[in-house]
Amino acid sequence: MKIIEEETQVNQDNKYPWEKFDFTVMSYNILSQDLLEDNSHLYKHCQGHILTWNYRFPNILAEIKQLDADVLCLQEVQENQYGTQIKPSLEALGYHCEYKMRTGRKPDGCATCFKTSKFKLLSSNPVEFFRHNIPLLDRDNVGLVLLLQPRFYCKTTTAICVANTHLLYNPRRGDIKLTQLAMLLAEITNVAIREDGHFCPLVICGDFNSVPHSPLYNFLREGKLNYEGLAIGKVSGQERSPRGNRILTIPIWPRSLGISQDCVYEEQEKQREKEKEKEEIEEEIAKNSEEVIVVAKRLPTDLHHSFQLSSVYSHYFPESGIPEVTTCHSRSAVTVDYIFYSATKDSRTKESGAGYVFDGGLTLLGRLSLVSEQDLWAVNGLPNKTNSSDHLPLLAMFRLEE
């Protein structure tokens, strides 16, 4: 039985309970059956019968029932099984489900589901990373960005933005991964920003096919990346062979994509700049001119985004320093799955220049414990008799406060 471990000291004062809203979020790559069968060499360590969908689905559903998250961010959800089994089963548990299938002829996609007793849906925004007119973006990965309204909360205007994605696997194509991430961040900015220019709280989940402290991971956490001289095979930290040593081009993605170096839709960025200019007073003109010069001198290899994100997991066990693992099969045992969140209340971005403010903040109350590679191989790796994906579920409990 896995446990929720306490992450921080929580104020238990319930004098004003309407000022708090507690909820849980799960991120889980459930392993598409077609992808399992197409990559059977990864599961040679498994007994054949435990790899069938008829065996795996009851285990996956039992895990979801046991953890009972308020929001589910699922990846590798196979479309034919989603319609006939997964969606009906989750609806019977009180979830509303949104689904985005991968483009092309890919069999699976991302599903984000939420308890209707805890949230109502304000908007559902699918993101397709394929662009037929941009050779770089020839892969069929997708994302899904939901805006959810908490029930039983005093601020009727407060919403939570939940993003779910599964980035490209190929370890040697960090250029594609970074561009897919920029596209997701641009859509999150578009969905999460309010009329007053503030952001609502954010939770970003998924399989990012990148290891902790890789350049892609650090970009998400720190909000900035200078990619000058960076090899495409080093972006995600997965590639250990000499292959993938080609250096990232400058710029990574073409102007025709319509996304700036700040990972914002360019039209949205132009509008924001116009509104900012109208608000400036006469005595700040000189200062504004200086700031414009600084922006103009920004290196073309500088990427930024407008969020301050924390990771629910620390990725290493504090006592031993042994790495936590979120996926394990015959070829690999690493962390590639994450839950990121906006932890700081009314915090401004440090260096992007966006000047965004968050309304409210998320406090991490607890998380589901992960295990080490050694722990997993003690039960014959993944999938096994009780864990029926090659990934482990992540789970976090948050508190939304004024």
Annotated model-derived regions:
Residues M1-A92, Y99-G109, A182-M183, G233-K234, ...:
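N-terminal, active-site-proximal structural segment of metallo-dependent hydrolase catalytic domains
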Residues M1-D22, V71-Y169, R173, G244-R246, ...:
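Structured beta-strand-rich core segments of catalytic domains in phosphoester-bond hydrolases
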Residues M1-Q12, A182, T189-V203, F208-E402:
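Metal-dependent phosphoester-hydrolase catalytic domains
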Residues L31, Q78, L168, F208-V211:
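Catalytic metal-binding/acid-base residues of hydrolase active sites
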Residues L35-L36, K65, A69-L72, Y82, ...:
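Short amphipathic alpha-helices and their capping/turn residues within compact interaction modules
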Residues D38-L42, R102, S124-V127, C161, ...:
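Short coil/turn segments at secondary-structure boundaries
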Residues G143-P150, C154-A163, K177-C205, S210:
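His/acidic metal-ligating clusters that form di-metal
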